Design a protein with these regions (language model features):
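ATP-dependent adenylation/nucleotidyltransferase module used to activate substrates
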Residues: 1-165, 176, 185-186
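AMP-forming adenylation/ATP pyrophosphatase catalytic core
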Residues: 20, 132-367
Length: 367
């Protein structure tokens, strides 16, 4: 357990989503002697998104659950309205990346621009030393170098280090993740013993502002645009069918294409300007080299020589052996030992050495 070390109780802002994980994180920090304040970020207006107030992240129901847990713990609780910034930095970027042909990861952007930026600044302005979340990952300081390290959570099935790779040294110094050494079953057991209302609440799975998964419909509703139909092409550029708008398809997709070509085909490429989608056999999806930008290094100040690593190009992918090479400021080139299926521009590629996150970036190209 993370224990408070001095006589004055250090302040801890608990990012409370209304779920069981952040609730137990709050309880653990309180038990360790921290002066806790619960905060829920209001990120969307449900009526603006055309969604029910009970089916999105940080919804009215989530706020009610978080408030009830805070009341049970007898800690202060507030709701902070970040809807304007969330719209600009998360939703509008999400749409922009899709329209450019990529596949965005808004949860990573939310951690970067909202949770570990806005909340840290709010905590500092209110005299609090730490921001606490319910992520399954660990933060430790390297005694030899003094650098803060991000490590995998001990519960391999719940490890969330992938979505935290862009935390800076300054942020890591003020972040506490008390669930990093626990398993999910232990967390639920604690919540049940404390009689928390959300002890058996299901984990959120979808993009918070697109809970039904139909991101193309959301984009059309949000922007007022209509994404027109276009041509499916084979690898030779021959038309093989008609699609419903290139933004509706992701690299590696097989289901929902509506093509009868005698053998399974997958989305292999998209040309957003021409509004075409190229399809082909699964073997056309594999690439060995990934280029990344917007790179953030954690365990090292910068990459100066090639390093052996393992890497993930998707959230819960099994790590794959690779070598990472410097490729200019804020960039790297990653060469996998074996070709990887559908590494996709817009997604994060995160590098590991053992259980330590070396760093990561955003995929911009593959070959």
């Amino acid at each position: 357990m993370i224990e408070a070390q001095n006589t004055k109780r250090p302040g801890a802002l608990i990012a409370m989503s209304g779920g069981v994980d952040s609730s137990v994180a709050a309880w653990l920090m309180q038990q360790a002697g921290y002066d806790c304040t619960g905060i829920t970020m209001r990120l969307t207006r449900n009526e603006t998104l055309g969604q029910s107030g009970f089916h999105t992240c940080c919804s009215e129901k989530d706020i009610e659950d978080a408030a009830e847990v805070a009341f049970a713990m007898d800690i202060p609780y507030e709701v902070l309205d970040f809807t304007a910034d969330f719209r600009e930095k998360i939703i509008e970027k999400f749409i922009r990346v899709y329209e450019m042909g990529g596949t965005p990861n808004p949860c990573i952007d939310c951690n970067r621009y909202m949770k570990f930026d806005h909340l840290l600044r709010w905590a500092e302005s209110h005299g609090m030393e730490y921001v606490v979340t319910g992520h399954y990952a660990r933060v430790e300081q390297d005694e030899a170098t003094g650098r803060w390290l991000l490590k995998k959570g001990l519960d391999e099935g719940k490890d969330q280090s992938y979505v935290l790779y862009n935390l800076t040294q300054e942020q890591l110094a003020h972040v506490r993740l008390p669930l990093g050494t626990l398993h999910k079953a232990e967390v639920r057991e604690i919540a049940e013993k404390q009689h928390f209302i959300n002890a058996r609440k299901h984990d959120s799975q979808d993009i918070c502002f697109v809970p039904d998964g139909d991101y193309a419909r959301f984009m059309e509703d949000f922007t007022g645009k209509h994404y027109p139909a276009g041509d499916f092409l084979d690898k030779n550029g021959k038309k093989v069918g008609t699609h419903n708008g290139a933004v509706r398809y992701t690299i590696g997709q097989r289901k929902g294409l509506g093509l009868a070509m005698g053998a399974p085909v997958y989305v292999c490429a998209k040309d957003m300007q021409a509004n075409t989608v190229t399809v082909g056999p699964e073997e056309n999806l594999f690439d060995r080299i990934v280029y990344a930008d917007e790179v953030n290094w954690i365990a090292i100040p910068e990459l100066t020589t090639p390093l052996r690593v393992t890497a993930r190009t998707r959230y819960h992918q099994t790590e794959q052996a690779a070598t990472v090479y410097p490729a200019g400021e804020g960039q790297f080139r990653l060469e996998f030992d074996q070709p990887q299926r559908a590494p996709t521009p817009g997604q994060a590629v995160v590098l590991y050495q053992g259980d330590v996150v070396l760093g990561g970036g955003t995929i911009v190209a593959v070959e």
